[in-house]
Each structure stands twice: as structure tokens, then as C-alpha cells.
Amino acid sequence: GLEFIESIGIDRINARVRSLIEYLANGLLAIKHDNGNELVKMFGPKGFEHRGGNIIINFFDPEGNMIPYASIEQMTNSRSISIRSGCFCNPGIDEINYCISNEEMTQYFMSRDHGGHEDIIQFLGKMRGAIRISVGLATVRKDVDRMLEFAQTLKNRHF
């Protein structure tokens, strides 16, 4: 494993991964619904200099409603496209992405003894979670093109 990586060179691997993730992100961000609304919102830095081999996104219908990440994951899985969805076991990032305040979180947790993902969505009136797409050493351009082709199937669709 390590000898293989050393034989290629970490700088070459990083350059290739950056190229693939930039191609993917730019391709996704270029897709618009016929009414001009964006299909994808990407979280994190806009540039690629300090971005690793993944992007965190959500898909939206033509009216701007977020398409549930679980639906996206089911659709991609049926096409043998591997993504990760949810809150990524990363406390705080989802709250930042959706502008959920400390006060809202305190109010939620102080008002119940238990609850789950759907319960907090209903309480806050805000969607939670996102989709993470990762590329790496084994990713080829065809893999990225398949994800972009999938994204095109969401254009102008209502869920």
C-alpha cells in the first residue's frame, strides 16, 4: 500500500484528486433548472486550493425545496454510485450549514427526553443533513461523469 503510493508520489495523487473534485464540483454547480434556479448548493470553501477530495452538497427542486438526502442516497445506490449522506457524525457542522442557533438547539433538547432526526427536523422546521461525495486514488473520470449524469436526471424534477 504505502510503497504503491510512494511510487506514484503524494503530490501527483493530490493534484489528480484536486482535478477530479474540481471537475465534479464545477459540473454540479453548472446544472440549473429551466427556471434558472440552482440544482445544487455546495458547502465549504469555494476554491479548491484548500479543499480535500470531497464536497458536501444538497440538491434542490425547481422551487428551491431541498430534496431529502435519503432519497438521493437511494437513487444513487440503485445506480451503483456510492455517496454518504446524513450529518456525518460531526457535531456542529450541520447546525452551522443550516444556521441553527444555540438557542434553537437548547430549546429542542430542554423540551424532551428523547427524539430523533425526524423529530428535530419537525421541531425546528428546517431540513438537516447533506450529501458527501468523495473522490480518491481509485476514482476515475468515468465515475465522476456517472455522478454528473445522475445529477442531470434531477433537473426540473419535483419530489
Language-model features: locations:
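Pyridoxal 5′-phosphate
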Residues: 1-159
